[in-house]
Amino acid sequence: MKIFFFIFAALFLLAQIFQARTAIHRALICKRMEGHCEAECLTFEAKIGGCRAELAPFCCKNRKKH
C-alpha cells in the first residue's frame, strides 16, 4: 500500500516538471516576439499570445502607433 503512494507522488512530480518546461518554452517564444509575460496587459499593450503560466497567462507587447 505504501508503494502506491510513492508511485502516485512520483507521477505527480513528473507532471509538474513537464508543465513547467512547457511554460518556460512559451515564455521564450513570447520573448522572441519582443513581448513579456504578465498577469494582465496594460492599456497601451496588445495581447499577442499566451504564456500559460499560472501567474502570468498573457504575452503582452507595446502597440505600434500608425
UniProtKB/Swiss-Prot annotation:
InterPro entries: Beta_defensin_dom (IPR025933)
Signal peptide: 1-22
GO process annotations (BP): defense response to bacterium; innate immune response
Coiled-coil region list: none
Alphabetical list of Pfam families matching this protein: Defensin_beta_2 (PF13841)
Family listed: Belongs to the beta-defensin family.
Protein's name in the database: Beta-defensin 107A
Species whose genome carries this gene: Gorilla gorilla gorilla (Western lowland gorilla)
Organism placement in taxonomy: Eukaryota, Metazoa, Chordata, Craniata, Vertebrata
